[in-house]
């Protein structure tokens, strides 16, 4: 395992590959039981442990919900030979962090297995790990969609709201975000804290206002690549997952 360092060559940034600056990089891969393929380039997030250290001092009893895009440890490293590092400049996706320095967004996916494992060490037990699409379906989003269809909104307004709500559960869009719920110091008493079929049909669905991006009018494309070019906050969803252990993201090269 090597680490990628960044230095200057004249007026240009350049990368230098050398020995890891800390044993934490190799320790993380060992903890995951992963041997990365030769030539693999990826990220390791060393900020998870200090983050949990801070959170554990704040939350003595309760639930921690993490919603983000990412993978579990094995597919995170085995299926992404070039890692997950991405940049966004004027809503355009790229992979070169050495241009538009200080102006473009730089992001990487979450490696959820380490989030689960490190969370356990700080007393946070995993309750569930699933896609955002499944999570919202469990909460009853289909009831809201049904209410919108039967509502008295004008057709254009109705379709705009249906478009946005369905997009939250699209498997090739926001529905592929992951939802991890962990708990600490809570006595569940054998009860299911995540009941399904909540009767949201009795509630009025939330609707768009002037602060929302109206995807239908923006001609939201069907492809994930098109979605990424419209997404204004520099995040991109991927894949889906079932209950298991999570992963993280980061800036250290492997």
Can you name each region flagged by the protein language model?
Residues 25-254:
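Long, Lys/Arg- and hydrophobic-enriched amphipathic alpha-helices
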